[in-house]
Curated annotation (Swiss-Prot):
GO CC terms of this entry: centrosome; cytosol; nucleoplasm
Gene that this sequence comes from: ZNF322
Protein name: Zinc finger protein 322
Localization (cell): Cytoplasm; Nucleus
Function: Transcriptional activator. Important for maintenance of pluripotency in embryonic stem cells. Binds directly to the POU5F1 distal enhancer and the NANOG proximal promoter, and enhances expression of both genes. Can also bind to numerous other gene promoters and regulates expression of many other pluripotency factors, either directly or indirectly. Promotes inhibition of MAPK signaling during embryonic stem cell differentiation.
Organism, scientific name: Macaca fascicularis (Crab-eating macaque)
Lineage: Eukaryota, Metazoa, Chordata, Craniata, Vertebrata
Length: 402
């Protein structure tokens, strides 16, 4: 396989052999493998029959056929056909956007991206989706959009056979196999596989929250979180369960809910092989293997503080509310309700649910509240075998469906 430079050298040698065109009496230079020059001006690629006025343009065309990409990025080792493409690409790493819109001051890495954007100001939206009527400034954007209706995913990963509707999504996915993370934060040097991940991360340093709700003035760093929040106001629940037709505002809530029907428990404890429907439940469970509560009278240990309390009541034969502070730092002698009230007054609400913005003192309370949204009933009554969300009257009778 010849490089474009070698082909160019061969063309120069061939020109000394073929001198005159028999039809027009003008000079004609022919390279039998790649190129024909007619009238000293037209260069034709014999692979695709495309004509060019300049030899350099022909070389660029040849590289699309040979796959040759001689220009390499020093930051991520990506290669390009033209030096101009490399220069445009390097602006991503340098966060440089030299092409500014005079109408709204938006900036872009490439002049073509600016041209496409400017059509939105001129009202020129030439490409309309026949299915939903949405307009686009470029035909390529319409083509990608239509795949959301057809379900077409033409970009296939050769490693795991996963398909994607966009080539950029495939490129990003491949990095999960290679471990490549070309986008680096200049503040903390943390690296990311996708540019959007880097942009979102940088907002943790700048404090920027560009997505603002016009209903309640809440703001968000991530567009996805903002979209989910807006559904609180609109009541929209686009994710529907195929088994019971219950609807949800978040896809993650639907996935968790569907495990009620399928019985799937993908989160497994490697210590005892117990399985759970939620990752949060697994994390909470794993703490039982690492934290123990010791009895001061006997050398017996418990995984839960509540088990220790019950044990102490049995062997001490004392009223439970007369105990002093135990070794683990809990006020066991206090009435539980009074203790919870004190926590409410003194502690901040650390656990917040993004769907309805309710906050809780404990992660367990947040997990129980989430079942209101997901419809999940992870506990079963030993007497009636009825599924429960762990309501107080049944709490003592309930055993977790692990």
């Amino acid at each position: 396989m010849y490089t474009s430079e070698e082909r160019c050298n061969q063309r120069t040698q061939k020109r000394k052999i073929y001198n005159v065109c028999p039809q027009k009496g003008k000079k004609i230079f022919i390279h039998v493998h790649a190129i024909t020059q007619i009238d000293g001006h037209i260069y034709q690629c014999l692979e695709c029959k495309q004509n060019f006025c300049e030899n350099l343009a022909l070389i660029m065309c040849e590289r699309t056929h040979t796959g040759e990409k001689p220009y390499k990025c020093d930051m991520c080792e990506k290669t390009f056909v033209q030096s101009s493409d490399l220069i445009s690409h390097q602006r991503i790493h340098n966060y440089e956007k030299p092409y500014k819109c005079s109408k709204c001051e938006k900036s872009f890495w490439h002049h073509l991206a600016l041209s496409g954007h400017q059509r939105t100001h001129a009202g020129k939206k030439f490409y309309t989706c026949d299915i939903c009527g949405k307009n686009f400034g470029q035909s390529s954007d319409l083509l990608v959009h239509q795949r959301s209706h057809t379900g077409e995913k033409p970009y296939l990963c050769s490693e795991c056979d996963k398909c994607f509707s966009r080539s950029t999504n495939l490129i990003r996915h491949r990095r999960t196999h290679t471990g490549e993370k070309p986008f680096k934060c200049l503040e903390c040097e943390k690296a990311f596989s996708g540019k959007s991940d880097l942009i979102s991360h940088q907002r943790t340093h700048t404090g920027e929250r560009p997505y603002k709700c016009n209903k309640c003035e809440k703001s968000y760093r991530h567009r996805s979180a903002f979209i989910v929040h807006k559904r609180v106001h609109t009541g929209e629940k686009p994710y529907k369960c195929g088994a019971c037709e219950k609807c949800f505002g978040q896809k993650s809530d639907l996935i968790v809910h569907q495990r009620v029907h399928t019985g799937e428990k993908p989160y497994k404890c490697l210590e005892c092989m117990r399985s759970f429907t939620r990752s949060a439940n697994l994390i909470r469970h794993q703490a039982t293997h690492t934290h123990t509560f010791k009895c001061l009278e006997y050398e017996k240990s418990f995984n839960c503080s509540s088990d220790l309390i019950v044990h102490q009541r049995i062997h001490m034969e004392e009223k439970p509310h007369q105990w002093s502070t135990c070794e683990s730092g809990f006020l066991l002698g206090m009435d539980f309700v009074a203790q919870q009230k004190m926590r409410t007054q003194t502690e901040e609400l650390h656990y917040k649910y993004t769907v309805c913005d309710k906050s809780f003192h404990q992660s367990s309370a947040l997990l129980q509240h989430q079942t209101v949204h997901t419809g999940e009933k992870p506990f079963i009554c030993n007497v009636s075998e009825k599924g429960l969300e762990l309501s107080p009257p049944h709490a003592s009778e309930a055993s977790q469906m692990s």
